[in-house]
A protein has these predicted regions:
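Histidine-centered active-site microenvironments of extracellular/periplasmic hydrolases
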Residues: 9-63, 70
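Secondary-structure boundary motif
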Residues: 13-16, 104, 153
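Active-site-proximal N-terminal segment of extracellular/periplasmic enzymes that hydrolyze or transfer
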Residues: 149-157
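Aromatic- and histidine-enriched alpha-helix N-cap/loop-to-helix transition segments
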Residues: 2, 69-70
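Short, solvent-exposed loop/turn segments at secondary-structure boundaries
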Residues: 63-67, 85, 152-153
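Alpha-helical packing segments of well-folded alpha/beta enzyme cores
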Residues: 2-7, 164, 168
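C-terminal cap/loop subdomain of S1 sulfatases and analogous C-terminal strand-loop tails that border
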Residues: 28-34, 60, 72-146, 159-160, ...
Length: 195
C-alpha cells in the first residue's frame, strides 16, 4: 500500500495527473481453510474474485459496484477511455458504463475455469459451478455470500440455473496435458477432497 501511495503521489505531483488512467487489479483470492480448502484451486467466490480499481480523468472516484466483471474487460475499457476504436474480436466488455454509474444495468457475467471441464458463471446475484464429473453447485449471493448452501436441487432456482448453464463452453480441452496442478480435486457431492 505504501509503495502504491508513493506512485500515486508522484503522479499527482506530475503534469500527467489529468491525462493518466490508473488500473489496479490483483491475482485471484485465496482460501484459508474454508470448506476444507487451502490456497485457491476452486471456482468458489473466495478463490475466483479479484480486486479491480479503475481511476480515470473525468470520472467520479469512490464509486463501488458488485456487478460481475472479468480481467478481459480491462482492455476494452482502456480503449474506450482513450477514445480508441474497439476491436470487434475482443471477448470483454467496456466497464465505462459502470464508471459513469456503478448501478447501471449490466447484463454481463464473469466466466472462469479451473482445471479441465470445471467452470463457474458469476452473475450479479448468483454463482453457478459445473464440474467435469457432472456435478453442479448454485449459490444465491443475496443471502449466502459465503456459498455454504448449494441450491442446485432447489426448484425455486430452476430458471436461473438453466440461464447460467447457457454460458458454459460447448467443449473443453486440456491447455496442458494431464492435471497441471498436481492437487487433489474437490468432490461437490461429498464436499470432500479426492485423489
Amino acid at each position: 500500500d505504501h509503495c502504491l501511495g508513493l506512485v500515486l503521489d508522484a503522479l499527482d505531483a506530475s503534469p500527467h495527473k489529468d491525462n493518466t488512467i490508473v488500473v489496479l487489479f490483483s491475482d485471484h483470492g485465496f482460501h484459508l481453510g474454508e470448506k476444507q480448502r487451502w490456497a485457491r484451486r476452486t471456482s468458489w467466490e473466495d478463490g475466483d474474485r479479484v480486486a479491480l480499481i479503475v481511476a480515470a480523468p473525468g470520472y467520479k472516484s469512490g464509486n463501488k459496484t458488485n456487478k460481475p466483471a472479468q480481467l478481459l474487460d480491462i482492455f476494452p475499457t482502456l480503449l474506450e477511455l482513450a477514445d480508441l476504436p474497439r476491436d470487434n474480436q475482443q471477448e470483454g466488455h467496456s466497464l465505462v458504463p459502470l464508471l459513469m454509474n456503478s448501478q447501471a444495468e449490466w447484463p454481463h457475467v464473469s466466466l472462469s475455469s479451473f482445471g479441465k471441464g470445471n467452470y463457474a458463471v458469476r452473475s450479479e446475484h448468483f454463482r453457478y459451478i459445473s464440474y467435469l464429473d457432472g456435478s453442479e453447485e448454485f449459490y444465491d449471493h443475496r443471502d449466502d455470500s459465503h456459498e455454504w448452501n448449494n441450491q442446485v436441487g432447489n426448484k425455486k432456482y430452476v430458471q436461473e440455473i438453466a440461464a447460467h448453464r447457457k454460458y458454459l463452453p460447448v467443449r473443453s480441452e486440456d491447455v496442458l496435458p494431464g492435471n497441471s496442478t498436481g492437487h487433489k480435486a474437490y468432490d461437490a457431492a461429498s464436499r470432500l477432497l479426492k485423489e
